[in-house]
């Protein structure tokens, strides 16, 4: 531990004691490029699972849906806002992972409380920038909204962003905890010679672990969102938590507590885990694997001379430097 601290001190001296959180234009360009590549790949790879979840949830509720128009067309309906939301979410996720990586390298043991505060901050930032677009993509995919009956407005944006904020907050906290620092710990259990394989498998495992804890709140969030209606004035009408609670209470009264729980566990929970687990495994594996494969400088080959430029900007410290 002492040796590691000494090595990090040398690194800080070579960097001129600049803050690791202040990115140069070169570092920012690399981060933006990496974020875009990872986010688009994740969005394209997981959209089919969103389609399957939509079909599953509508079949469980017995509500007719607009999931029609051919397999590919139906599967990727609403992909544009989903991809844009993925870009925003990816920016938050990759930045969160990068921040934790810098913290580990520069301070080698950040306080546990500080890491959790960072996780909470980034999970809330993710909701703020992407929940509205993700909700629109979901409703568009199932045919609730379309170009004719939906227009962006402050009211509609707020409805889509806040409709399931509470349940998404819990799920997002778990996801970002695993992306930020717990996922690397899981990766350390794999002992392949190539660290890339360890990262991919660690990411996939983290995604499955996250699914076990986030399926219930995500299922509630999706159910609440999918009950959204469009009024005649193109304003969205969402259901309240009180309405959701009333529906669950009526169901429990009708079938009994034990039967309601077993139905939820066997039908809703396990079926959704079967879809959400591979979706999360692919998402986390791509984030961890592509982050490792691309490294901190994916643009190095198309931005020549940058290494020499850095060396000229940060000359080696004098041997007499304390």
Swiss-Prot record:
It is found in: Secreted; Host mitochondrion membrane. Changing residue 134 to A: Does not affect ability to catalyze degradation of host STX17. It holds the Pfam family SLC25_like. GO terms for molecular function: serine-type peptidase activity. InterPro entries: Serine_protease (IPR041000). One of its GO terms (biological process) is proteolysis. Changing residue 68 to A: Abolished ability to catalyze degradation of host STX17. It comes from the Bacteria. Keywords: Host membrane, Host mitochondrion, Hydrolase, Membrane, Protease, Secreted, Serine protease, Virulence. It is an enzyme of class 3 (hydrolase). Its EC number is 3.4.22.-. The keyword Cell membrane does not apply. The keyword rRNA-binding does not apply. Its main location: secreted. The active site is at residue 68. GO terms for cellular component: extracellular region; host cell mitochondrial membrane; membrane. Serine protease effector that inhibits host cell autophagy by targeting SNX17. Localizes to the host endoplasmic reticulum-mitochondria contact site and catalyzes degradation of host SNX17, thereby impairing endoplasmic reticulum-mitochondria communication, leading to inhibit autophagy as well as staurosporine-induced apoptosis. This is Serine protease Lpg1137. It comes from Legionella pneumophila subsp. pneumophila (strain Philadelphia 1 / ATCC 33152 / DSM 7513).
């Amino acid at each position: 531990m002492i040796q590691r601290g000494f090595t990090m001190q040398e690194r800080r001296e070579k960097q001129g004691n600049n803050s690791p959180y202040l990115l140069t234009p070169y570092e920012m360009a690399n981060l933006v490029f990496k974020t875009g590549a990872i986010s688009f790949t994740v969005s394209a790879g997981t959209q089919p699972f969103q389609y399957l979840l939509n079909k599953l949830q509508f079949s469980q509720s017995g509500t007719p849906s607009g999931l029609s128009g051919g397999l590919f067309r139906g599967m990727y309906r609403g992909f544009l806002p989903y991809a844009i939301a993925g870009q925003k979410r990816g920016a938050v996720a990759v930045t969160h992972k990068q921040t934790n990586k810098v913290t580990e390298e520069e301070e080698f043991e950040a306080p546990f409380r500080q890491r959790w505060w960072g996780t909470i901050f980034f999970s809330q930032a993710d909701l703020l920038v992407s929940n509205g677009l993700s909700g629109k993509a979901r409703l568009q995919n199932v045919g609730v909204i379309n170009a004719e009956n939906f227009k962006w407005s402050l009211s509609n944006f707020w409805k889509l962003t806040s409709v399931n904020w509470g349940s998404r907050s819990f799920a997002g906290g778990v996801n970002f905890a695993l992306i930020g620092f717990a996922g690397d710990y899981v990766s350390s259990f794999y002992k392949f010679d190539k660290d890339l394989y360890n990262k991919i498998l660690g990411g996939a495992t983290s995604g499955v672990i996250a699914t076990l804890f986030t399926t219930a709140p995500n299922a509630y969030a999706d159910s609440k969102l999918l009950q959204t209606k469009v009024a005649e004035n193109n304003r969205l009408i969402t259901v309240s938590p009180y309405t959701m609670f009333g529906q669950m209470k009526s169901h429990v009264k009708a079938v009994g507590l034990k039967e309601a729980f077993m139905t939820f566990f066997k039908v809703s929970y396990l079926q959704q885990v079967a879809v959400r687990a591979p979706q999360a495994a692919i998402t986390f594996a791509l984030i961890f694997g592509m982050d490792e494969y691309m490294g901190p400088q994916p643009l190095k080959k198309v931005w020549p001379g940058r290494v020499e430029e850095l060396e000229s900007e940060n000359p080696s410290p004098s041997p007499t430097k304390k």
